[in-house]
Amino acid sequence: MATCWPALWAYRFYLIVLCLPIFLLPLPLIVQTKEAYCAYSIILMALLWCTEALPLAVTALFPIVLFPLMGIMDASEVCIEYFKDTNILFVGGLMVAIAVEHWNLHKRIALQVLLIIGVRPALLLLGFMLVTAFLSMWISNTATTAMMVPIGHAVLEQLQGSKKDVEGGNNNPTFELQEECPQKEVTKLDNGQPVSAPSEPRTQKTQEHHRFSQGLSLCICYSASIGGIATLTGTTPNLVLQGQVNSLFPQNGNVVNFASWFGFAFPTMIILLLLAWLWLQVLFLGVNFRKNFGFGEGEEERKQAAFQVIKTQYRLLGPMSFAEKTVTVLFVLLVVLWFTREPGFFPGWGDTVFANEKGQSMASDGTVAIFISLVMFIIPSKIPGLMQDPKKPGKLKAPPAILTWKTVNDKMPWNIVILLGGGFALAKGSEQSGLSEWLGDKLTPLQHIPPSATAVILCLLIAIFTECTSNVATTTLFLPILASMAQAICLHPLYVMLPCTLAASLAFMLPVATPPNAIVFSFGGLKVSDMARAGFLLNIIGVLAITLSINSWSIPIFKLDTFPSWAHSNTSQCLLNPSNSTVPGGL
């Protein structure tokens, strides 16, 4: 029997995949309705996503098989959901991000900002957080963290080395990056036998450095998650929301676009980032703000050491290449086109130049992203000239384009594209089967709870759930249910969908919650308890910041104070309950 458990554990994923469908079979066999069939599919996929018995993208393919066989949707209708406009926006945005990463433009931006902000302890934390958050707005959180953590550790090692030299009366003329961790300090007697140096001030300095190292590591992974919420393409849950809104409410008039999302989420990100900086500063640096800002004894020497590390890394990048300059121009052009396509407060180029009969823009944010990506495939990475092939002297060779398909194929997370499509297919199947309407009817008692309280409770639920489940899977599962609930109680759907989408990015407590946390944890120096202690209060702060945003500046942006006509599932019910159709009345 003792040898049975290791075997079961080793084959646990196979057992889960085989047993789960059988265990859930009573639901469709006893309740033979389309709603039950769809519920069976959703519960099965939710459990597989939570356990990760199959890769997330593989589970996302289940609707292609289950929905046609159960009579929920035609196969052709299901497959369309896997490559919608939101998927195109995701692919196009990632292509631009891949170009930025491929030509090291993100590293140049990071080092330049750190040189400007300075390297005093509190400012160093702020500098790393600002840079990481800004980069996470445009490229993946994982790539940003993977780049920033080594830079942070190089600075920390130089700071530690500088401390030792200052205490020992030595100078540190060289500031090269150290790849190995500094050895433990020992002193030797005349006989050559090492003994520990029980210097109390030095022990205290070592403890301070360790706490500062923990704080810097956590500030990088936390700001990567926080920064991703600021833009529509910053992290995948944001795109899941846009896709779900467009799928569930086709007549919404493109209410969630790049400009409207930025107006809502960017101020939220700034507030949360500053509060996170203050919390991490207090937790790991203490409340001696004079010392935190570098006015203590010997701080100038340490500051110069860290500054030289960053300056050396920046110098190694060399001057900006033609490719970097081109990517910068195209990146800025992309952002400008996104903002001006349909800004909302003045007619955009999409509404005026490319409008249809109804006056609506025929171009989308995905159109812009793909256009800029195509340009990157056309422009050469070097100024055209008479270049010779080094392998074949005398033969001319054209430089590669700024973006090549090999580069894109190697770095593009195609699994996320499929995962997005699976979420949209689930939402569509839930709508067509009638499951969404059934859930909405069951959730009508929530209309007696104030909307603000409902939003807070749901945010806390999502924030807890996302600690142990992929944030993409979390939003994919919950957003259709939240939309149905909002329709049933005549509440603006975005009033609950927007904050819960942001809450899915509040994965601060566990290393397994999100890849940036795992990357930082893998570098060492952190325990799970350290991350949980810092992340618990940060989760609470995040929910409060989101609650503030959804009840203030978000109301005029998305018109959250009314129940929109495009969200009516039962018009007569909403007309009979007008008190529930406005957010401020329930606050």
Curated annotation (Swiss-Prot):
It holds the Pfam family Na_sulph_symp. The keyword Membrane applies. It is found in: Apical cell membrane. It catalyses: succinate(out) + 3 Na(+)(out) = succinate(in) + 3 Na(+)(in); fumarate(out) + 3 Na(+)(out) = fumarate(in) + 3 Na(+)(in); 2-oxoglutarate(out) + 3 Na(+)(out) = 2-oxoglutarate(in) + 3 Na(+)(in). Residues 188-208 are annotated as: Disordered. The chain crosses the membrane at residues 13-33, 53-73, 86-106, 136-156, 264-284, 329-349, 367-387, 407-427, 445-465, 477-497, 506-526, 535-555. One of its GO terms (biological process) is fumarate transport. GO terms for cellular component: apical plasma membrane; plasma membrane. Li(+) decreases succinate transport in the presence of Na(+), by competing at one of the three cation binding sites. It is a multi-pass membrane protein. Expressed in large and small intestine and in the kidney proximal tubules. InterPro entries: Na/sul_symport_CS, SLC13A/DASS. Its main location: membrane. The keyword Metal-binding does not apply. Belongs to the SLC13A/DASS transporter (TC 2.A.47) family. NADC subfamily. This is Solute carrier family 13 member 2. It comes from Rattus norvegicus.
